[in-house]
């Protein structure tokens, strides 16, 4: 009978991750993101996923003066740099560094094949860094889940409130003017 042994692991820092990119260890062909010190493979974006991200980006740009970043990194020091599908961030240039938690007002993840990962890994990660609101677009389930008001203790991080909306309209709980017609969102999707 064999027993699993917990081996010590080295968590990569955001600096380590950036050096791996700069030196060519990681390239544009490597579809990974840094989550809690680990390099996590990202599923390639299929046409449906890409369409939902583009549609959401287009709609959001008409509703806010915030900068709408599509599939671009946000830095969550010291060991995470996820690439959310959409990040609504403070409207300024990010020439020297990717947005930090204090710059991010809302994140949207489009989950066509990544629902479990997004809900069990990314939502708590975003809560830990006090991202005010997160939406998960559940493509297969035909719903949008909204999480807001991060609640962080020494033991865990989660959102104090959540709701799941399948029809009609979902409205941001933290950013005035952000609304999404789910009937329009699901038009043309399978």
What annotation goes with each model-predicted range?
Residues 1-190:
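Gly/Pro/Ser/Thr-rich low-complexity, intrinsically disordered segments predominantly at protein N-termini
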């Amino acid at each position: 009978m064999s027993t699993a042994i917990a081996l010590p692991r080295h968590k990569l820092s955001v600096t380590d991750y950036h050096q791996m990119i700069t030196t060519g260890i990681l390239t544009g062909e490597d579809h990974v993101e840094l989550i809690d010190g680990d390099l996590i493979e990202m599923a390639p974006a299929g046409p449906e996923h890409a369409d939902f991200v583009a549609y959401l980006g287009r709609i959001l740009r008409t509703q806010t003066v915030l900068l709408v970043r599509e599939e671009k990194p946000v830095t969550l020091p010291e060991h995470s740099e996820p690439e959310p599908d959409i990040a609504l961030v403070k409207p300024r240039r990010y020439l020297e560094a990717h947005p930090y938690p204090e710059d991010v007002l809302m994140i949207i993840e489009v989950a066509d094949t990544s629902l479990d990962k997004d809900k069990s890994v990314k939502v708590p990660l975003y809560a830990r860094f006090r991202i005010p609101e997160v939406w998960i677009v559940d493509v297969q389930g035909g719903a949008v889940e909204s999480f807001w008001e991060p609640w962080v203790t020494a033991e865990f991080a989660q959102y104090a409130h959540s709701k799941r909306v399948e029809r009609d309209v979902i409205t941001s709980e933290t950013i005035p003017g952000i609304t999404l017609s789910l009937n329009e969102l699901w038009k043309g999707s399978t």
